[in-house]
């Protein structure tokens, strides 16, 4: 696509969930939000930030075998270095470079239980400058994926107040960016899927 390249994943609830499935769905969402909200000093790579995403899952004794995210090229490859998020260096991957302004990186934590189910929430983040002060140049991310996270999979009791605010703010952004392009029926659907929790 000459307009650019994107990568997105959503898991949608299609029936009743067990308590375990709902806990995993909620924790994946929390992991995604935590990384997206990072503020960090210039010079960090995804190796420094990966724990923000994996942390909630590691607290449960769960991990996913892949990286948390990868760089995204423009009219090139969907998976492209030198940026990415993972907790350890993998020699054959070119994804441990410093995060620079304008780099786009996916944020895609997940839970994958063989023979049972998989859950992933994936957005794209663009690295932007935040404030500069006596400690140095701070960086942060802006979310550039505008698709709702299925609230039927979320247990608000498993989220902190901060995480609920982040999810509500994300859904407000989705509504504001997407609703002007939809017809009445589509707007009603989006309104339900971006409601506050």
Question: How would you label these PLM feature ranges?
Answer:
Residues 1-197:
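Active-site neighborhoods and metal-handling regions in enzymes and metal-associated proteins
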């Amino acid at each position: 696509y000459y307009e650019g390249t994107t990568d997105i994943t959503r898991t949608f609830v299609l029936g009743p969930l067990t308590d375990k499935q709902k806990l995993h769905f909620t924790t994946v969402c929390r992991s995604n939000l935590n990384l997206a909200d990072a503020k960090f000093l210039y010079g960090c790579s995804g190796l420094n930030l990966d724990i923000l995403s994996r942390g909630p899952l590691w607290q449960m004794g769960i991990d996913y075998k892949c990286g948390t995210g990868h760089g995204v090229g423009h009219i090139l490859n969907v998976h492209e270095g030198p940026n990415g998020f993972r907790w350890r260096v993998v020699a054959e991957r070119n994804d441990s470079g410093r995060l620079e302004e304008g780099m786009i990186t996916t944020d895609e934590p997940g839970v994958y239980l063989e023979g049972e189910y998989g859950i992933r929430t994936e957005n794209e983040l663009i690295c932007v400058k935040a404030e500069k002060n006596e400690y140095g140049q701070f960086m942060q991310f802006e979310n550039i994926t505008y698709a709702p996270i299925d609230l039927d999979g979320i247990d608000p009791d498993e989220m902190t107040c901060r995480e609920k605010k982040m999810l509500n703010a994300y859904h407000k952004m989705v509504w504001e960016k997407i609703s002007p392009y939809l017809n009445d029926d589509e707007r009603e659907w989006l309104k339900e899927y971006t409601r506050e929790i």
